[in-house]
Amino acid sequence: MKLPLGLLMICLGLTLAKGETNLPPVFTQTLNNIILYENVTVGTVVFRLEAYDPEGSPVTYGAIGADHFSVDPVSGNITLIKPLDREEKDTLKFLVSIRDRVDPEGESERDNVVEVPITFIILDLNDNPPEFQNTPYEADVNEDAAVGTTIFDKITVKDRDIVGESLDLKCLPQQQSPEACRKFRLHIIKRDATILEAAVVLNDTLNYNQRMVYHFQIEATDGPHKTQTTFEARVKDVQDKPPVFQGSLSTVIDEDSPINTLVLTVHARDGDTGEPRKIVYDLRTNPNDYFLLDAQTGELRTAKPLDREALEDSTGIISLVIRARELVNGVPSDDPLTSATAKATVTIRDVNDSPPVFNHKEYSVSLLENTLPGTPLALDMSVSDADVGINSKFALRLDDVSGVFDVEPKLVTGYSQVNIRVANGTLDYENPNQRKFIVLVVAEETDTNPRLSSTATITVSVLDANDNKPVFEQESYSASVSEAALPGQYIATITARDVDSGSYGDSGIRYSLSGTGAELFHVNEQTGVISLANCHDNGESNRRERRDLNEDEHVEEDDGEGHLEMLSMEAATREIGTEPTVQYTLITQAPEEQASSVPLPAPVPHAAPSGVPAATANDDKAPQTCLDYESETTYFLSYKATDDNGRGSASVVSLRISVTDANDSPPVCESPLYRASVDEGAVVFDSPLIVKARDADTMSRISYRIRGSEQVESIFDIDRETGQIIIRPNATLDVTNLNSDQLIFAVEANDGLFTAHCGVNITVRDVNNHVPNFEQQSYSAVVEENSEIGTSVERVHATDLDTGKNAELRYRIQQGSFDDFGIVETTGEVFVSRKLDFDRRNTYQLQIQASDQGTPSLTGTATLTINVQNSNDKDPYFVPATQHAEVRADAPPGQLVYTLIALDPDVANHNALEFAGTDDITAIDKEGKELPHYDQFKEYFKISRNGKVSVNKQLDRNLFAVMRINVLVTDSTAPNVQQGRGLLIIQIIDVNKNPPRFNAPWSVEQPQIKLQMVEEQPVGTVLTTLQANDEDSSIGEFNISDNDYFAINQTSGMIYTIARLDYEVVKEVKFQVTVSDTGVPALTATADVVVDIINLNDNDPKFSQSDYYFNVTENSPRGTVAGKVEAHDGDVGVFGEITYTLIGENNKYFSIDAYTGNVMVANSSILDREQIKELTLSVVAQDKAPAAVQKSATATIHINILDVNDNAPVFTRDVYNSTVAENAAYQPPAALLQVQAIDQDEGLYGDVRYIITAGNEMGLFKLDAQSGIVYPAQSLSGKHGAYELTISARDTQGSGTMESTTKAIITVLRVNRHKPEFVIPALSNATIEIPGDIVQPDYLLLTVRAMDNDTEENGKVSYHLQVNNRNEQQTGEFKIDEVTGELRAKTQLNRKNRANYDIILVARDAGNPPFESLRLLSVSIVDANENRPEFPDASNPYKVSINENSGRDVKIGHIQAASRSKHNRDIFYYMLLGNEDGAFYVDKLTGDIYTNKSLDREETDVYTLYILASIKADLHISEEERASFSIKTLNRDNTVAKVAITVLDVNDNPPVFEKPIYYAGVNANAKMGAAITLVNATDADQGKNAKIEFMIVASNLYKFGATKSTGSIVPSPFAISQDGRISANTIMAEYNQDRFELEIVARELEQPQSSASTKVNIWVFDGTQLVRVILSRPPEEVYQEQEEIIAELRNATQHRIIVDEIRFHLDSIGRIRMDWCDLYFHAVDPQTQQIAPVDEILKDIDRNYDYLKDYYAGFAIENVVPAYIAIVQDEFDLAVAGLVALVIVLFVGVISFIVLCCCLKHWNLSVPVETRRKEALIKKQIIEDLNTTENPLWIEQKLKLYEEQELTMQVFSEPDHISNSEAPGHLDHRSSLEQVHHVGQTVDNTYATIQPRNNQNRLTGGGGAGGGSMRSGGGASAGGVGGAGLLLARVDPHMNEFADYATLRNNRAPSLYEFTGSTFQAPIRDGDDAVAELI
């Protein structure tokens, strides 16, 4: 640098010295070592040259040799023009020049040029990924290599960058070897930023048999960059597998087998199959040293005698551990890799050497004398035999001379509990000989020789029992008493006798009464004296009388001073919509006034008198008695006598007590309030208004008078005798003159002693006779477009001259609002209801209607015109908001790029919108990176005010590839600024020139790439990675041609496998790879890739079958071929050649040809089927590959030994025993036992069938002949005892000669049906609290009690504690008495040690099987000083009951809490929960519970109250506190009592029928007893009060066509059952076509025997009057939707539809379709009440097709057809027929001869027209089995099935005068059937209807055109198009039954009958008497 500067100074000096020399320009900067990073982007200014000229002339800059840079000659900016790469060159040097201008004219040779070198140093960045060297990586490793062994150390990774993080490696597992990275690890040997060396180290043990090859990915990373390669580790096999046992290691040997008996032979082989070693054996365990094992052969033999009973395992199984060891150098090895153990099991087959043994020798038991037969004795007896199998089978019997007892089971195998039962006879304690029995039980073996046995003794003691009931002298008793009788009045004495003694006899009898009203009477329980009970409470000083006068609405109270206070409540409920008004009047009367004055409340406007009338007596001195004749005249009671002091047996007789009458009843209004309505101006009521009162006393006469205002009495009058209210003749009813439209007053009813007041409410109806009138007929208004919702627009008003509701007006908008305006209904104010839009609608014409509330309602209308004023209120907006444009990179400035689009609904001219761009502009380079904001970006494009976007400056795609400009649109006409924003995206399109190129060895001239790959590589193995480059753009993607084996990563170019490569399938794979760049347009290059596949021995031999089954007959000679096995190896060459060998335990009996695979008999001695039925061999197929890679396969050969028939069936047991409960199911039947007989033969000869030959005389059992399972044939309930059946077994499916028999003993036991139910404690989680800090031992905590509804032993309950799932009598702290249930403390319980215990109580019955119930009990020990009151048994709820309708203040129960305080403090009671409706209240001081209102059981039948006991006298419980209470917490709280109140039923509801009227039909052919219909009535009461009976009270007959009844038929032709089923009570044929109207009454069985009535209309029909609906749904679903189907058919036909039957559908071959059904109905004309014709109903259905078609899919209706169709079979005159036939023959003959002569000279050989017609009709196959219908209603989707037939058939026209052009209305579809038509003319009628033949033809007659006639429907028949075929069959004219559909199908009619396209119309002919079913 110093040298050039020196030279420059010398030159400068010389120049100055001359004085006129021009000095050169000078650089002002140092140009050496300028630093640049290699990632500087192209186009960046990297340096700025600066220089000056001493003379001040301008200078220009230049560069020499600068490949990467360009120099701006003016500014001196050095710009990068080519990407930098430090790895290619880290220093760039070139010359820069500076030139001054000596000549002002321009450049000249005299200009000074200075050239100076410049140096750029390129700094490195981490921009290159790591690179693996010397790939691919692979290694071999032995499977026994030690962990830590280095298996490969040649991994080298280099990084061209010198900066960045240190290189690192990572192992990535692959799908085919997920555990590879666990087996191997990467060890770093050397590492820095540029190079890394590593090794692969074994990290876990290997196993060749588990995996032979491992693949994993090695990933190298330098931080941001990653590179991957594949590593393959191949595992080599070594000798490391222990021996493997083969064959079965289980066998059976007899217990008495001699020493040295062969037990089994052990086989094992070396687990390493390459070079297997020899195996030796030894025993590791040998229980009792029973066995010896041969070390060489593996034979296991007995070493000493065996004893099965000496074994610990009762099953007789001995487990041996056998070791197999490999011989290594002739010495057995002990290490785990060369030895193995296995467990062998030897089962010792038992021999008989042990007798049966009882668990005790002696037993004793007691039982009552009334013990029932079959009851088991309470014995713990069991018996067992230590032997097994038949050696353990023994029989039990009794040595019992009395014959009273029996033992079960009779036969036992091994072990059983023994039951001794009372078998027969009745035990009688009074017989001294029956007080004790001694019985001997004998157990003796049955199937052994000798038969071993043992005995046990049972002593049975009989106890006395109460076995006689008290006996009354009469079956029933009766008595009477006056209703005025006083308490204590004697009524009767009734006693009984009992023949038992002591308390079981007369002295122990106790008497009691029960039944409704029993509380009114008292019986002395010892003497039987019956008297009247005291039912009054006389304990209070002041008399408080609550006398029920008309449901307690009138109450009198005596205050103790002789004054009566009468509380009269008046309540009236007005019409719906008004509130009820109630008036209370309290009148105090002195005693002297009570007899004369009658209080009457003054009328209250709009209030009725008493809701329930009050009655007042003139004398209150009547005696107060308990009986009331008017309430109950007779009491039917049960009188019971119970012995044993009321605890024993009982007898009951009926007792009737009659009550005699007394005069004490006041008059009662039949209705508390009478209502009537009358029009103003009327002179009479529409219906007579009569007020009625009744008096229970028959001698009373009631008179009436009106009590009301003067106005009322001036208008109305009443008849004093009848109570009829009339309008006085001179009275005028005018609403305007009345204070109200309701006149309210009372009518007084008086019988001379009592008075009642009946309320009357008369409404005077206004007449609606004025229409509403608007003030204006037209209104107008203006509203702004931007008005808010709810803005008032206009108010309209109308008036009505009527009054009341007739003058109440309601406004509504009829039309014109378009939901933009609404109106206030009551005020008429119109308001904006939705946002207005002038552009959508600017004018509205609203029609407003005002209507009054009268009946009928009158209306008036007016018009409101609303004009909407527009406002500019909407912003302009771009459409779309983001808009896109493209422009080429070489587009010149000024070129139009895009025109922006925006809209504004408020402006009419688009020119009002102005566009502009914003400064918010962003750009993206061609790499996809967003660039920082530069101001010069806005210079490239220009946006005009009209939205035109154009190029403003030359574009540079290297600077940016995409530009995003935020644009703005403004409404220039808006009063305020209205703008819209959008986004314009402009993409710069590049121009591509150079295609990409693959790396070498690929070239354009030689585009082939050859590769190799070993077969059987896992999917995903990388083949190679192709690389490519492009000079002017980047690489876009790689693509591969379609092939089955390889795919390519489109980004990296990595080619990998997608399928398994098999050399045997494909040896070479060819495909093409295409690479494309990212330029526009994209350019590509293609490489042809050829992959050669390298062969491996990778296929195992495969047998053609995994199992082979061969048959060989017994005694086959040596060499007999049993079969052939075949295997195939998919490899090629020696790898695919196979040899065969046999292995296995039985291989010595057979041999195999090593090459052909033929399996032959080698030793026939084992071929004995009775010993061995099947032999199993293993065959091995091996290829001929070297041992290291040799492969094999194994298959199993099953050789079946064929048999001959030589064995009889043998039952597995001589006697089968089964015990079954009496409730065993028999529908479906439950299996009781299964007998089994084994026939050693096979096939048919071994197929056994079973039959019961004896013992089933009662038919209780049935036997499945094939399975041998015995089932109950009927219910076994009540049929206790043992049944012995003899069962026979016969082979050859029951037809053979071999037979054997056995016995089956079935014992039917009583059933233990019920589980015990806890009574105490009652709650499932009960808690008891024990006071005191310390509880002493034996302290009684609780007496547990449970009930079991079973009887005898099944109902006997014992009590236990559950500990660890076992029932115990005691725990560490508690004990329980098993019988009494007393739970006591076992030890001292100290609260300080433990305060709470949880116990599980168990109640268990003694049934078989026993049932038990569990209950959790918590015991809490509380402080004795706690003084809160508690209920003694809070866990057990109080239970009380009360009759419904009982009055208020009735005491129903009492609760009592106790305080633990030493001081007797007061306890107060508060209601907590359960009384939300206020039905009850509790006395705060006493705990008494009272009713607070009358109860109704039908509303609520059970109440549960929670009542708190507290010491606080003023406790207040808020509603929030009540809502927070938890039922679970209250149940555990001892301070809270739970009271369960049951409301008992009173017969206060009458029956109610489900329908007011029923409709039904009955066939005229119905027999007596035929079911017709069912009527249902229900009673809301309960129990016996809900029981009702049905009666037919009238059977009114309406003859056919009559409108009046001929009267009721007696006796009725119908009967009704007690479940409401109506049936025929006579033959119905005589009433054919008549109608009955039955009056049915449902009446209660209990008093007062309320009743209800209904009517049933029954039509007697003929079968031809039914219509059949076919539905593709089961009957049960159709029953559920029956009413909906009827409703739709009724709407369509306008007839009453009556369903007569629903039954299963029969398909085309006569099978029952359980999922389809047919519904039969008849239709009744509602005007004439007669059955409508079938064709009329079908016409109605046709006409309503559009209405019904929407319903048929939902109801699944497939077809609607007549149930029957009548066909006439006319008489046939043979003589006339013969004459007609002769004339026709002669006529046809003459005509034919003439025609023949005329046509001879015009002979033309062609196919006759008639032949073509017949083919058209006959050759077309008819589709028969279609679910179409004869109604066009159901054919909408089924036309195409007949399309071919419709388009091809020819139809004969009928009369000549009918043509295709005639209208459908000119054809009579029915009557045309009776016409006779000529045949001979044919027409083309595509949619013709084929009708049945004329009535002169027979179905069996000839076919063809001459056999009958057809008529043309002209395309206009009533039926429409398509439809199902109609098949008709002739039947016997005297029969009336269904046709056989199968016969119709098999004996088909000619083709003329096979198609119809119309609705079926039943022919109407005189004399029709033949019936056929329409299918």
Swiss-Prot record:
The chain crosses the membrane at residues 1776-1796. Residues 1887-1899 have a biased composition (Polar residues). Its main location: membrane. Residues 1900-1916 have a biased composition (Gly residues). Residues 537-549 have a biased composition (Basic and acidic residues). Residues 535-560, 1887-1916 are annotated as: Disordered. It comes from the Eukaryota. It is a single-pass type I membrane protein. Keywords: Calcium, Cell adhesion, Cell membrane, Glycoprotein, Membrane, Metal-binding, Repeat, Signal, Transmembrane, Transmembrane helix. Residues 28-132, 133-245, 246-358, 359-472, 473-669, 670-774, 775-878, 879-998, 999-1103, 1104-1211, 1212-1318, 1319-1431, 1432-1553, 1554-1677 form the Cadherin domain. Residues 1797-1975 are cytoplasmic. InterPro entries: Cadherin-like_dom, Cadherin-like_sf, Cadherin_CS. GO terms for cellular component: plasma membrane. Residues 18-1775 are extracellular. Glycans are attached at residues 39, 77, 203, 424, 730, 761, 1039, 1049, 1111, 1163, 1217, 1325, 1349, 1492, 1576, 1691. It is found in: Cell membrane. GO terms for molecular function: calcium ion binding. Three calcium ions are usually bound at the interface of each cadherin domain and rigidify the connections, imparting a strong curvature to the full-length ectodomain. Cadherins are calcium-dependent cell adhesion proteins. They preferentially interact with themselves in a homophilic manner in connecting cells. This is Cadherin-87A. It comes from Drosophila melanogaster.
